[in-house]
Amino acid sequence: MVAKDYPFYLTVKRANCSLELPPASGPAKDAEEPSNKRVKPLSRVTSLANLIPPVKATPLKRFSQTLQRSISFRSESRPDILAPRPWSRNAAPSSTKRRDSKLWSETFDVCVNQMLTSKEIKRQEAIFELSQGEEDLIEDLKLAKKAYHDPMLKLSIMTEQELNQIFGTLDSLIPLHEELLSQLRDVRKPDGSTEHVGPILVGWLPCLSSYDSYCSNQVAAKALLDHKKQDHRVQDFLQRCLESPFSRKLDLWNFLDIPRSRLVKYPLLLREILRHTPNDNPDQQHLEEAINIIQGIVAEINTKTGESECRYYKERLLYLEEGQKDSLIDSSRVLCCHGELRNNRGVKLHVFLFQEVLVITRAVTHNEQLCYQLYRQPIPVKDLLLEDLQDGEVRLGGSLRGAFSNNERIKNFFRVSFKNGSQSQTHSLQANDTFNKQQWLNCIRQAKETVLCAAGQAGVLDSEGSFLNPTTGSRELQGETKLEQMDQSDSESDCSMDTSEVSLDCERMEQTDSSCGNSRHGESNV
């Protein structure tokens, strides 16, 4: 889901590689020299969100994680590009269209480079990368409309209403970026160098506030697109496009996600320009102002996107009985994390961690829409007990303590429990790996700590979910003193979870009432 911190990316020129072919039995032929490898520019990188570690991060990094999760869904819904299609025939595969990566020093007069310092050349490269990225973005947005939207509308593959939902306000973004590209070209000197970009950015960046509606729509757009892929005509059309050279092996959602991906890169791009700008350059002050502007816009869009995603999933909760409804769900504006789970009986569940309540559901189809039917009563976070289970403590089938299955330990389990009077629940959850298990543990602990602190209880949670009093240093369990004392009869549901997009944004709740989590669709037939 996430990886390491990623420094500012500048495309690099790849060296030619020669291939030595073994001699053939026929007439000898010179081995052909392959063409240069080409590197996809910044706009082709799926998301810097994939390059951020699961630790405390800056608001900007948390936002990129949030948006990435907002459009990350089950891989099962994606077409298998390697699978043979009935209409494929045995024709020679068409060559994939690639976009050349360009450097400023390779594009303009080399003599100019010799007159500039190394620092200034790096500054020009960063400015050129900004400009080239705008050009690539505009080209891709126009391609999405021309190659996907318009043909599907003309061929009645989707209705106009469905296409409007999926493409959102994409059309309105094109003129914004055309304006910036035009201004950047206007200030470029005949020799290719650019002296000042700060004033242009300060004047242009505020228009990116219009991204809020586009980004807020992405969760619903992705859900509808995944649903429409079940239609044979839609799947066939998208597969043909994917295998066509113009797509560069990118599917439709890759194109629709490019604006969001570009948005979260602006602070990095501007910081790189600023890093190579001398202190006495008038551009420095303007660049610092521009960075503050874009970070404010990113934070605001982060908030609105989080609220939109939270609303989306709340609207798709199905209650089996009136008693399952909880005011904590209705009042939630933050979805910390959610993911598909599987219990030790093989039952798939989908768990949502809102800011103050944990909701366990089963994914079902209702009126041709993916919905989430509540599986048990919602669990208030403040009363939730969390336990990190050692490998081997849970066995498929429900047995506990040192159990084994086929001589292999059952790994990556943790348990959430709740007891309030006559009501009690115990759920043993299994993550798909150690990394995702730790993400869930961190997120639940952070959510619980935030709720308890908001209630006026100072302290922190230890690794076992116990609340530590900072004054006495003593451990105070919220609820029963030991999880083993809880009722584990018919209220137990041992779950296993696929949490490749679990959110670590719970810390964000301490600073704002909004946050988003990951989104991943799951289907469960129980």
Curated annotation (Swiss-Prot):
Q: Mark out the compositionally biased spans (Polar residues).
A: 466-475
PH domain mapped to chain residues: 291-449
Name where it's found: Cytoplasm
Among the record's GO biological process terms, what is one? positive regulation of Rho protein signal transduction
Work out whether the entry's keyword set contains Transferase: no
Positions where Phosphoserine occurs in the chain: 47, 70
Q: Which residues form the DH domain?
A: 122-304
Keywords of this entry? Cytoplasm, Guanine-nucleotide releasing factor, Phosphoprotein
Q: Which GO terms describe its molecular function?
A: guanyl-nucleotide exchange factor activity
**GO CC annotations on file:** cytosol
Question: Which residue ranges does the record annotate as region Disordered?
Answer: 20-40, 464-526
Role played: Acts as a guanine nucleotide exchange factor (GEF) for RhoA and RhoB GTPases.
How is the quaternary structure described? Interacts with RHOA and RHOB.
What is the designated name of this protein? Rho guanine nucleotide exchange factor 3
